[in-house]
Amino acid sequence: MGKIIGIDLGTTNSCVAIMEGNNTRVIENSEGARTTPSIIAYQEDGEILVGASAKRQAVTNPKNTIYAAKRLIGRKFDEKEVQKDIDLMPFTITRADNGDAWVEVRGQKLAPPQISAEVLRKMKKTAEDFLGEPVTEAVITVPAYFNDAQRQATKDAGRIAGLDVKRIINEPTAAALAFGLDKQDKGDRKIAVYDLGGGTFDVSIIEIADVDGEKQFEVLSTNGDTFLGGEDFDQRIIDYIIGEFKKEQGVDLSKDVLALQRLKEAAEKAKIELSNSSQTDINLPYITADASGPKHLNIKLTRAKLESLVEDLIERTIAPCRTAIKDAGISVSDIDDVILVGGMTRMPKVQEKVKEFFGKEPRKDVNPDEAVAVGAAIQGQVLSGDRKDVLLLDVTPLSLGIETLGGVMTKMITKNTTIPTKFAQTFSTAEDNQPAVTIKVFQGEREIASANKLLGEFNLEGIPPASRGTPQIEVTFDIDANGILHVGAKDKGTGKENKITIKANSGLSEDEIQKMVKDAELNAADDKKKLELVQARNQGEAAVHTVTKSLSEHGDKLDAGEKEKIEAAVKDLEAALKTEDKAAIDEKTTALMAASQKLGEKMYGDAQAAQGAEAAGAQAAASGSAGAAAQDDNVVDAEVKEVKKG
């Protein structure tokens, strides 16, 4: 078996690494560089350029040079972030037939995984040239806060590039592997990985422990923003230059695609220079021309000015850090080391902000551009069986569940659960003789299902006629090691089952994810009220069902007055159930239970008489029912409602 290579598929730059024995090796590409720009150019003659060669010709071919394709991967065209990018990118972002965001190049529509596959192909070739043998297997990294659709799309990109993707691994986790593997410290260490790359931001809290000579990397929590990175910092510089030039020369460069491409290059260069010097000159001769002749651009940019332009972007990274610390159940003082990953963390202001939040100097012994690829290569060695002393325990970033009676979100797997994981719960039907149930799968933190993101739905049909609550429908959630979700439903009585894998075209935007979490906090009280109303309603409906059934079976044992009293209480409760008044529902439920007490006594008396008649048999029956009760412990008192198809 050949080597499993590690690839960091970045928004701005990509990197490939391998393991040589116990040593990691970042491989130089054909131009001799250890990182490759994630830029793809489509030439007029059909040739495709990738990396530095694509970057060099971007100024003369802006409409057919694609960069930051990772920002579009697994996303819908209508998403706010995609719409924002449409106005900024020189190339055309278009809507695909399935609603996804694709790119149009030379009259041809291309999916982001197709474009990213070109970068992966270059990484594959880089490794093959170095090893002198074909490479077919890889571990590819993604931002920890990537959702199901984005992970699936990244896997698809690998397949398009001719790679069998053995594992999708989270970038901060990979960086922790690279950092922690050669550390000889005994005892547990908690580290924070702050990963600010070209297009995405992640933070993970990871515990590194020595367990019987094995290094265990356990992710305690993760958070982030998949639409925040170096590209946004560059854009602030570009906007500033455009504004200054307009003031000086009266010319607006924002509509000139050739000028924009030169500005992008200059902005990135200035940003990098200002990490080491206090000011830089942005000098672009012949940037444009008007009736009076050619115009030259010459602007001084100081580090202080840059910091003021991007202050809010840096500040945006702190809230996810705070949430990650809280979700991990620790305090900032418990963090032993802070690791910086991603090129943007070279910016002094970013380092200063991180130091201010975590109260300690970030480590400088990790290469922010290479650590992620190195970690992916280590994981590749673990998967190939060549390394036995590493155990990696990652997590899922958001809660997953299904909609149950009353529109409640019944969470099956909560956020920050270690993966791979599998969880099953038994539900039942909401109506008598219900032939099918619709399983709706949601992702998010809200208590009411409709406030979360619908990932997919499917039917389980052919349920034999039975009274409500009798059929046993087992719903299974299974998240694999790549963080991809599979859901199944099985009728325990008939053995019939149905399964769904959440597909890439049902992606979740980072904005939606953040909105869900924020909404969950803001609307916690509102959700609580709705939840209490649903619970009261479910209780009331169950009471109506039970009493009505008992009345039909044992009503003849009551005198007419008692029976009428119960029937009236049932009517009152049924009327209350149609309202939104929880207090009224509770009151009428209590009234019905009180009114039906006599009926209960009659039923209890009959049962006692029957018991006395066969005392010996009763003991055996009791032991049998105890066993049955134990078996039913995993049955949850929640119900799935059938969605009637018109």
From Swiss-Prot:
Pfam families on file: HSP70
Coiled-coil blocks: none
Key words, A-Z: ATP-binding, Chaperone, Nucleotide-binding, Phosphoprotein, Stress response
Region (Disordered): 606-646
Origin: domain of life: Bacteria
Phosphothreonine PTM positions: 200
PROSITE patterns per record: HSP70_1, HSP70_2, HSP70_3
InterPro entries tied to this protein: ATPase_NBD, Chaperone_DnaK, Heat_shock_70_CS, HSP70_C_sf, HSP70_peptide-bd_sf, Hsp_70_fam
Inducing factors: By stress conditions e.g. heat shock.
Compositionally biased spans, kind Low complexity: 607-631
One function term, GO molecular function aspect: ATP-dependent protein folding chaperone
Function: Acts as a chaperone.
Family of the protein in this entry: Belongs to the heat shock protein 70 family.
NCBIfam families, sorted: PRK00290.1, PRK05183.1, prok_dnaK
Protein name, UniProt field: Chaperone protein DnaK
